[in-house]
Regions:
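N-terminal periplasmic accessory domains that precede
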Residues: 117-122, 132, 166-169, 186-191, ...
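Membrane-embedded beta-barrel scaffold of Gram-negative outer-membrane proteins
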Residues: 560, 568-572, 599-657, 678, ...
């Protein structure tokens, strides 16, 4: 490192230390201010002596729930409950009471309150507001789909009673392909328009999902806490703070204003049990809010494997037979408690949370089903604390502020302590190497404490123009040790990322034209202390601290020609910094690679969409999108030459182009038919090998990647079945098709001898019934209805036909 580099690094360190000190002082002042505000609020509440209560109704007589009844000039306010009733506690005196609700004229009434008093209000419809509401009253998912970004938006409410997890729900979405291994709790690979794995980032309420802890993914997040899912394709908005190459998935949790309890229990094939509980209690007068959630899942995962080769002693040859998995148990426990203040004048939400997760999994196979484990296990444990603050009109009008801080203690233990080689019968022979690592016995501990800070500021200049600034810090340590393997060298590495995004949004011509332009800055700092296996990991070249800095940018635009036709296009030069698993390995089966470079891609989308109203109760919705992805320094998992383990490397570039489309037909709220299809042309862009020789796989299709796939969904719904109010019967059927594809490079060997994964046809069906206005619900589901043999990553078999049932109780009247 040059003296100039040393000087710049020293200046950077001094600046960073000053920034940290300043940040700590600001935080101290902020905490003191928040405590004072809370104290003042408590004092106001403690001095309240009288109660003002009553009801809010429309002039036609119907009750109005969620109307805001507030005291002008104070922070006092309450929302009406489902019966339209409200309660306010206050000191005796004269007040101006304000009653407001979308679609109705605001009421202002001057009243005198000397003792407990009942005051009822009747609201008059506002024709102008109602007309505007018809235009703007679309669901958030629909408005998002009509933005400048290419995005799938999925409302979870119609699917809340389903036994499906998020993987299954997202996997049916347009342009998405999810491939799972080993049943419940198995690893999975999600592809968005061809780019998959770590090229896709996951968020929950705009916060990286990794903050939840090791082992937490789409498959084990309970659906009853989720409102909707946003899937961004290729171009990701700067407000997410994502270094995503192929896209991002943002899970939006429920933000209910009502109190509720939501509990469910499900049981199914292969010894599967799943229980979820979530709830919320908010005291309207003080704004104190408590939100607990708990989730438990267990599965034996002992489904049948078909056509497995085993050694037959009598015939002295390998024969094919069907056998059950026997070392594939999965158990997960997740719990979270969130508490704080909501809906006050000084904050929309100030919430503190603590969460815990534990995931224990037996390992049955390696990367392919020819490698069988019989004793190896993996356990992940995490504990997280966090704080979140949100306020509209923060300090000035039209400035919305979101601040989030969290710290997560994550640990993973991989146990690999037997010198055995197993087969599918459960038999084993003694060997001179462990099952996973192929070296000595080990119990590998990896601790990765993670700190995340996010600040998002959104300023609306007016209804047509807004600016958003987003800052995201993630700082992770890598503390690894092995008390069993005496040759393993412990170390403590560190990896930090700063991502700053700035975006400008226009909404012109009464919403017909929408533009978004953005720029992102990616800064990373890697500190390497480990020195073992330096000839594999490159640690000798990266010892000490190294930094990188990259710029990304993009824009998107949408123009609505008519209700039946809108056009949108978006582009991003995206940058993805290596993830901790890629840089630091996983402590057992994946080696570190400290020489990894950030990957980049130029992503382009051009799409059409629209709504066609066929008749009074018939509607047709369509969407089609053409996309191009040109990725450089593409990070890909490859087999390491030494000891046969894996390692991530910048080994290739990838060129992808394709087209996708979706068509939806709705008949009132009774029938919905949805069909989508995707075609990918994903090819290697690497022309030459490292030694300069031509690469035989140049312009070959990428191996082990589906390139044609489609989904069809049929949903029938009947409300007030047999004239009984508050009931709902729902039937769903979905069909998935995956075209055959090569398991290995198509440029290797003769066509007839190549391994292929055959075309697959998968059917699922479900039935749910709810009564008492959705309070009680029961669901039944059959997956892989026709019991077909289904494959996924590297031809690993998935479960055959299986059955599941689920009971759910939802209470929001208390």
């Amino acid at each position: 490192m040059s003296s100039d580099d040393d000087f710049r690094l020293a200046v950077s360190d001094v600046f960073f230390l000053k920034a940290v000190k300043s940040f700590r002082e600001d935080m101290k002042r902020t905490v003191v201010l928040i405590i004072l505000l809370c104290f003042i609020q408590w004092e106001v509440f403690a001095q309240s002596k009288v109660v003002l209560s009553g009801s809010v109704k429309a002039k036609k007589g119907s009750t109005i729930s969620q109307a805001l009844v507030s005291v002008e000039g104070t922070s006092l306010g309450a929302y009406t409950n489902k019966e339209g009733r409200y309660t306010l506690k206050m000191n005796p005196g004269k007040y101006t009471i304000v009653v407001s609700f979308m679609g109705y004229k605001t009421i202002k009434s001057r009243i005198k309150v000397q003792k407990n008093k009942v005051q009822n209000f009747k609201m008059e419809e506002d024709a102008i507001v109602l007309k505007s509401f018809e235009v703007e009253g679309k669901t958030k998912s629909r408005r998002l789909k009509e933005s400048a970004f290419t995005v799938n938006a999925i409302d979870i409410k119609p699917l809340i009673n389903s036994t499906n997890n998020l993987n299954a729900i997202i996997g049916r979405s347009n342009g998405i392909k999810i491939r799972e291994n080993g049943g419940v709790g198995g690893d999975f690979d999600l592809s968005i328009n061809g780019l998959s794995g770590n090229s896709v980032r996951y968020f929950i309420d705009g916060i990286p999902l990794s903050s939840m802890g090791s082992g937490i993914n789409l498959a084990n997040i309970p659906t009853n806490i989720i409102d909707r899912i946003e899937i961004y394709k290729g171009v990701v908005p700067a407000r997410l703070g994502a270094d995503a190459l192929g896209g991002a998935i943002n899970i939006i949790t429920k933000k209910n204003k009502r109190n509720y309890i939501d509990a469910s229990y499900g049981y199914g094939s292969f010894g599967t049990h799943k229980a979820d509980f979530s709830g919320q209690y908010t005291q309207e007068s003080t704004g104190i809010t408590i939100k607990p959630s708990v989730s438990y899942c267990f599965s034996k995962n002992n489904y049948e494997m078909r056509g497995i080769e085993v050694w037959d002693e009598e015939s002295r040859e390998f024969i094919k037979t069907n056998l059950d998995r026997y070392h594939n148990d999965y158990k997960s426990v997740l719990g979270q408690i969130e508490a704080g203040i909501t809906n006050k004048s000084w904050c929309d939400a100030l919430l503190f949370s603590a969460s815990y997760s534990n995931i224990d999994k037996e390992l049955q196979t390696g990367a392919t089903q020819s490698i069988v484990y019989g004793m190896a296990t993996r356990e992940s444990e995490s504990f997280k604390v966090s704080a979140r603050y949100k306020k509209k009109d923060f300090l000035i009008n039209n400035l919305t502020t979101n601040i989030y801080l969290s710290h997560t203690q994550k640990s993973t233990t991989i146990t690999d302590t037997v010198f055995r080689k197993y087969d599918w019968l459960g038999n084993y022979i003694n060997s001179g190497r462990s099952e996973i690592g192929g070296r000595g016995k080990s119990i590998r501990y990896t601790k990765r404490p993670l700190t995340i800070v996010r600040t998002n500021l959104n300023y609306s200049i007016n209804k047509q123009h807004s600016i958003n600034i987003n800052y995201m810090l993630t700082y992770l340590k890598n503390d690894r040790e092995d008390k069993y393997d005496k040759y393993f060298e412990s170390s403590e590495d560190a990896f930090g990322k700063h991502i700053i995004g700035l975006s400008y949004t226009q909404n012109l011509l009464n919403g017909k034209l929408n533009n978004n332009i953005f720029i992102k800055d990616y800064y990373s700092q890697l500190e390497v202390k480990q020195m073992d296996l330096y000839w594999i990991t490159g640690s000798d070249e990266k010892t000490g601290t190294t930094t990188t800095n990259n710029i990304g940018y993009g824009l998107g635009t949408k123009y609505k020609l008519a209700e039946e036709l809108s056009i949108k296009t978006s582009y991003e030069h995206s940058v993805r910094l290596p993830r901790s698993r890629e840089l630091l390995g996983n402590g057992a089966t994946v080696y570190p690679n400290f020489n990894l470079k950030p990957e980049s891609s130029d992503n382009l989308n051009i799409g059409l969409f629209g709504d066609i109203k066929i008749a009074e109760r018939h509607a047709l919705n369509y969407e089609t999108n053409f996309f191009v992805r040109k990725a450089k320094d593409y990070i890909r998992l490859v087999i390491a030459q030494t000891e046969g383990l894996s390692q991530y490397d910048n080994v290739s570039s990838v060129n992808i182009k394709g087209i996708e489309g979706e068509l939806t037909y709705d008949y009132d709220d009774f029938l919905q038919i949805k069909a989508n299809a995707s075609y990918l042309d994903e090819r290697s862009g690497t022309k030459y090998q490292e030694d300069g020789k031509p690469e035989i796989t140049y312009n070959n299709r990428m191996p082990n990647r589906p390139w044609i796939y489609s989904n069809i969904e049929l949903n029938l719904q009947k409300r007030n079945l047999f004239g009984k109010k508050g009931t709902q019967l729902r039937f769903g059927y979905d069909f998935q098709y995956v075209h055959w594809f090569y398991l290995t490079w198509e440029g290797f060997g003769a066509l007839k001898s190549k391994s292929t994964i055959p075309s697959q046809y998968i059917s699922n069906a479900n039935l749910s019934y709810g009564f008492s206005e959705g309070k009680y619900n029961i669901s039944l589901e059959c997956k892989n209805l026709f019991d077909r043999t289904v494959y996924d990553n590297y031809m690993l078999q998935k479960p055959g036909r299986s059955f599941f049932c689920k009971f759910r109780i939802f209470i929001n009247k208390f």
